[in-house]
Amino acid sequence: MPGHAFNESHAQRSGLTGGVSDRLHWIGGAGDDCVPGHYSIGIRTFTSSIANVAPRLSLRLHELASAGQSTELTKLMDELVIPLYALRSRRKGYEVSAMKAMMDMIGLVGGPVRPPLVDLREDEVEMLSGTIEKWRPWL
Protein backbone atom coordinates (compact mmCIF):
# COMPACT_ATOMS: atom_id res chain seq x y z
CA MET A 1 0.00 0.00 0.00
CA PRO A 2 1.74 3.17 -1.16
CA GLY A 3 0.04 5.31 1.48
CA HIS A 4 1.21 2.98 4.20
CA ALA A 5 4.80 3.03 2.95
CA PHE A 6 4.77 6.81 2.76
CA ASN A 7 3.24 7.18 6.21
CA GLU A 8 5.71 4.70 7.68
CA SER A 9 8.61 6.48 5.99
CA HIS A 10 7.33 9.86 7.16
CA ALA A 11 6.97 8.54 10.71
CA GLN A 12 10.48 7.12 10.62
CA ARG A 13 11.86 10.44 9.42
CA SER A 14 9.95 12.29 12.13
CA GLY A 15 11.30 9.86 14.69
CA LEU A 16 14.83 10.35 13.45
CA THR A 17 14.65 14.13 13.44
CA GLY A 18 13.02 14.46 16.86
CA GLY A 19 15.49 16.05 19.24
CA VAL A 20 18.19 16.69 16.66
CA SER A 21 16.43 19.14 14.34
CA ASP A 22 19.08 21.12 12.46
CA ARG A 23 21.92 18.78 13.45
CA LEU A 24 20.64 16.00 11.18
CA HIS A 25 21.36 16.38 7.50
CA TRP A 26 19.82 14.21 4.83
CA ILE A 27 22.49 13.27 2.33
CA GLY A 28 21.35 12.80 -1.23
CA GLY A 29 23.13 9.69 -2.48
CA ALA A 30 22.54 10.57 -6.10
CA GLY A 31 24.63 13.05 -7.99
CA ASP A 32 24.71 16.48 -9.48
CA ASP A 33 21.77 15.76 -11.78
CA CYS A 34 19.44 15.41 -8.77
CA VAL A 35 20.34 18.71 -7.09
CA PRO A 36 17.14 20.61 -7.99
CA GLY A 37 14.84 17.79 -6.90
CA HIS A 38 16.71 16.96 -3.72
CA TYR A 39 17.00 20.55 -2.58
CA SER A 40 13.30 21.11 -3.24
CA ILE A 41 12.46 18.50 -0.57
CA GLY A 42 14.99 19.66 2.00
CA ILE A 43 18.05 17.56 1.18
CA ARG A 44 20.98 19.97 1.24
CA THR A 45 23.88 17.76 0.24
CA PHE A 46 24.74 15.54 -2.70
CA THR A 47 27.50 13.37 -4.04
CA SER A 48 29.28 15.12 -6.88
CA SER A 49 31.28 13.46 -9.61
CA ILE A 50 31.53 16.87 -11.27
CA ALA A 51 33.61 18.05 -8.29
CA ASN A 52 36.45 15.82 -9.50
CA VAL A 53 36.72 17.90 -12.66
CA ALA A 54 35.12 21.27 -11.88
CA PRO A 55 34.70 21.75 -8.13
CA ARG A 56 33.65 25.37 -8.63
CA LEU A 57 30.73 24.23 -10.79
CA SER A 58 29.67 21.69 -8.18
CA LEU A 59 29.83 24.34 -5.46
CA ARG A 60 27.82 26.77 -7.61
CA LEU A 61 25.05 24.17 -8.05
CA HIS A 62 24.90 23.87 -4.26
CA GLU A 63 24.89 27.64 -3.75
CA LEU A 64 22.12 28.26 -6.27
CA ALA A 65 19.97 25.40 -4.99
CA SER A 66 20.47 26.49 -1.37
CA ALA A 67 19.47 30.05 -2.22
CA GLY A 68 16.42 28.93 -4.18
CA GLN A 69 17.72 30.58 -7.36
CA SER A 70 15.95 28.15 -9.65
CA THR A 71 16.27 30.16 -12.87
CA GLU A 72 20.06 30.25 -12.82
CA LEU A 73 20.23 26.69 -11.45
CA THR A 74 18.04 25.42 -14.28
CA LYS A 75 20.24 27.20 -16.81
CA LEU A 76 23.40 25.54 -15.46
CA MET A 77 21.67 22.18 -15.27
CA ASP A 78 20.41 22.42 -18.86
CA GLU A 79 23.66 23.74 -20.33
CA LEU A 80 26.33 21.95 -18.30
CA VAL A 81 25.03 19.04 -16.24
CA ILE A 82 22.28 17.31 -18.22
CA PRO A 83 24.37 16.94 -21.42
CA LEU A 84 27.11 15.20 -19.42
CA TYR A 85 24.60 12.90 -17.73
CA ALA A 86 23.04 12.09 -21.11
CA LEU A 87 26.43 10.89 -22.35
CA ARG A 88 27.05 8.98 -19.14
CA SER A 89 23.74 7.15 -19.50
CA ARG A 90 24.63 5.69 -22.90
CA ARG A 91 26.25 2.59 -21.44
CA LYS A 92 26.52 0.86 -18.09
CA GLY A 93 29.58 2.12 -16.26
CA TYR A 94 29.97 5.28 -18.30
CA GLU A 95 29.43 7.26 -15.10
CA VAL A 96 32.99 6.28 -14.21
CA SER A 97 34.42 6.17 -17.74
CA ALA A 98 33.29 9.69 -18.61
CA MET A 99 34.59 11.27 -15.43
CA LYS A 100 37.97 9.54 -15.71
CA ALA A 101 38.24 10.66 -19.34
CA MET A 102 37.38 14.25 -18.38
CA MET A 103 40.01 14.24 -15.65
CA ASP A 104 42.62 13.00 -18.13
CA MET A 105 41.56 15.63 -20.67
CA ILE A 106 42.12 18.54 -18.29
CA GLY A 107 45.49 17.30 -17.04
CA LEU A 108 44.42 15.43 -13.93
CA VAL A 109 44.84 11.69 -13.58
CA GLY A 110 41.62 9.81 -14.15
CA GLY A 111 43.42 6.77 -15.41
CA PRO A 112 42.06 3.66 -17.06
CA VAL A 113 38.77 2.09 -16.07
CA ARG A 114 38.81 -1.37 -14.54
CA PRO A 115 36.96 -4.26 -16.16
CA PRO A 116 34.15 -4.86 -16.69
CA LEU A 117 33.84 -1.13 -17.43
CA VAL A 118 34.97 0.15 -20.80
CA ASP A 119 36.45 3.39 -22.07
CA LEU A 120 34.39 5.83 -24.08
CA ARG A 121 34.34 5.43 -27.84
CA GLU A 122 36.29 7.96 -29.90
CA ASP A 123 33.16 9.87 -30.97
CA GLU A 124 32.09 10.09 -27.34
CA VAL A 125 35.51 11.45 -26.35
CA GLU A 126 34.96 14.17 -28.95
CA MET A 127 31.57 14.94 -27.42
CA LEU A 128 33.22 15.16 -24.02
CA SER A 129 35.74 17.63 -25.44
CA GLY A 130 32.81 19.87 -26.32
CA THR A 131 31.52 19.57 -22.77
CA ILE A 132 34.90 20.57 -21.39
CA GLU A 133 34.95 23.65 -23.62
CA LYS A 134 31.60 24.72 -22.17
CA TRP A 135 32.98 24.10 -18.69
CA ARG A 136 36.17 26.18 -19.21
CA PRO A 137 34.97 29.07 -17.01
CA TRP A 138 34.48 26.59 -14.17
CA LEU A 139 37.84 24.83 -14.45
Predicted regions: what they are:
Residues 22, 36, 45, 55-56, ...:
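Non-transmembrane, interaction-prone segments in cytosolic or luminal domains
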Residues 56-59, 97, 126:
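Residues on a specific face of well-ordered alpha-helices
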Residues 1-81, 88-91:
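Catalytic alpha/beta core domains of metabolic enzymes, predominantly
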Residues 108-139:
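Flexible C-terminal active-site loop/helix
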Residues 39-43, 81-115:
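Conserved short secondary-structure transition element at the edge of the structured enzyme core
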Residues 66-71, 95-96, 131-136:
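Short, structured secondary-structure boundary patches
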